[in-house]
Amino acid sequence: MCSSDLPYRYTEGGSISTPFYCHLCDIMAKFAELLGLQDDVDHFLFCKRFATNAYNAMFFDVATANYENGSVTANLLPLAFGMIPEEWEGDVFANILNMTENRFGGHVSTGVVGIQQLMRTLTDRGRADLALKFATDDTYPSWGYMVRNGATTIWELWNGNTADPSMNSGNHVMLLGDLILWEYEYLGGIRALEPGYSKILIKPTFIDGLDTVRCAYESVSGRIESNWRRDGDMMIGEILIPANTTAEVWLPGDDEVRKFGSGRHTLFTRVR
């Protein structure tokens, strides 16, 4: 989100609303499955398929592998929400990277809507390095740029200190996007496998240039920790698993899942 008259920075409303409708259909189908309502599961999945087919017919350009005007948000949302035919996913993601790294110089290239899915989608598709650059950058546009220019909360606009007309809000937390989720779920790798964190997944992402991660989460089951440091070609981890819970640990480079009970555990893995 910025104050700009550049058309490639904007995404048409229709190409935003439908992906979120499809995302909500997925969520409702999961709710229905938990309740044992198979007819409702089938209904919501049908609604998603119907909307997805119409959306792709309306907005997807086969010649360029772009949605709508090719903005990062226009391509990112259908990719994040599983709406793109599998054979086109790689080309659409390549367009996201091309726009981000070339036109935007490796900077954040979405507004308040797209930023909700940006960090996780990049990491899921093998570009955690780019997500880390976004998280640590302090040049415009970035979260670090806000901090460097005196912000103590998240601005409404990436260019909030220079926008004309000026921004309305200097406390616009939604522009933080999925940054904090990404830090906990991807850098620390802490996720719930079962409700209430009675069963925990620890699946950290190791990124070149990031040598130390310390992550703790106060879950309803107790404190969970996932701490990692690099030592040469080894990653050394210390995890804390709450009482009466279990954890599965998936580490890059490991061929199998490690399973742990309650307590503090030290782990070693070689970084390939």
Model-derived regions, located:
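Short, small-residue-biased leader/transition segments that mark boundaries at the very start
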Residues: 1-3
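Solvent-exposed loop and edge beta-strand segments that line ligand/cofactor-binding
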Residues: 5-20, 57-75, 81, 99-115, ...
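Conserved structured core elements
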Residues: 15-25, 38, 42-45, 49, ...
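Well-ordered alpha-helical scaffold segments within catalytic/enzyme domains
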Residues: 20-38, 76-86, 116-126, 182-189, ...
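Mature, folded catalytic cores of secreted/periplasmic enzymes
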Residues: 23, 43, 50, 54, ...
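Surface-exposed helix-capping loop/turn segments at secondary-structure junctions
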Residues: 30-40, 57-65
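Non-catalytic C-terminal accessory modules of carbohydrate-active enzymes
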Residues: 32, 45-46, 129-272
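Long, well-ordered core segments of solenoidal/helical folds
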Residues: 45-64, 85-105, 127-146
